[in-house]
């Protein structure tokens, strides 16, 4: 299990994002949403407060569409975990219990914002203010780069759930990283082959489920096409980030 949960504080509640939960437990986000909708309906029918478990919200995908997701409280995570069996359920439980406890300890140890500002002079307050804004921008950037594992690519996927490299470039939306530059970047980083079989993926990345290679008949013969899975697109985003290529996030 390579995914990790991020616990956030919102209006005094500690929450995790259903998109991260779906990735961690190996489910499509749409399937998890369907399950949560079912849990919410049962809770409401029993006249229980569903907001103590799940808080419905929206986010914008790479194309600007508003899509549904949920924030899960610790109780909500308990409910999802209770429906799971096997190693994924155990690992998910271990992750969210640990992350919630870490966040709770951090909040208890954190001095109040008012106390902090009272101890500062005017210059220090200004520095603290802009430092906090910078931290928020960096957090937003991280969330954007890590966002919607399935929904992010929906409009670019073909009927087999695959994308061409040019479609990946459009989906991730990094300035200056169009199709040709993305091909070049992947060749330079030994993800795609340079030379014979140019732009075909190395076998180890095919075996990891990042790429598929298809053949297509053209007027000049058979052409080989490299296609990317959603998992492969996320791998490419992480690789770009590692090499300093980031989306421009508005302040």
Swiss-Prot record:
Keywords annotated in UniProt: DNA-binding
Record InterPro entries: Ant_C, Phage_regulatory_Rha
Source domain of life: Bacteria
GO MF, any single term: DNA binding
Protein name as catalogued: SPbeta prophage-derived putative antirepressor protein YoqD
The species this protein was found in: Bacillus subtilis (strain 168)
Gene expressing this chain: yoqD
């Amino acid at each position: 299990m390579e995914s990790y949960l991020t616990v956030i504080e919102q209006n005094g509640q500690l929450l995790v994002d259903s998109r991260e939960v779906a990735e961690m437990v190996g489910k499509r986000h749409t399937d998890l949403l369907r399950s949560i909708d079912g849990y919410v309906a049962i809770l409401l029918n029993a006249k229980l407060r569903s907001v103590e478990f799940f808080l419905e919200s929206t986010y914008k995908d790479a194309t600007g569409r508003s899509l549904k997701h949920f924030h899960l409280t610790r109780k909500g995570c308990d409910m999802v975990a209770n429906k799971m069996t096997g190693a994924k359920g155990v690992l998910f439980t271990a992750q969210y219990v640990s992350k919630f406890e870490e966040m709770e300890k951090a909040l208890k140890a954190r001095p109040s914002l008012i106390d902090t500002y009272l101890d500062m002079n005017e210059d220090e307050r200004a520095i603290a203010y802009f430092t906090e804004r910078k931290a928020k921008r960096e957090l937003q950037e991280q969330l954007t780069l890590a966002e919607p594992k399935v929904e992010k690519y929906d409009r670019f996927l073909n009927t087999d759930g695959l994308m061409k490299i040019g479609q990946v470039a459009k989906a991730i939306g990094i300035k200056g990283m169009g199709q040709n530059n993305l091909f070049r970047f992947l060749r330079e980083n030994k993800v795609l082959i340079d030379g014979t079989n140019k732009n075909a993926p190395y076998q180890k990345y095919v075996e990891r489920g990042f790429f598929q290679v298809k053949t297509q008949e053209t007027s000049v013969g058979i052409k080989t096409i490299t296609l990317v899975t959603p998992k492969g697109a996320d791998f490419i985003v992480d690789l770009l980030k590692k090499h300093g290529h980031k989306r421009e996030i508005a302040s």
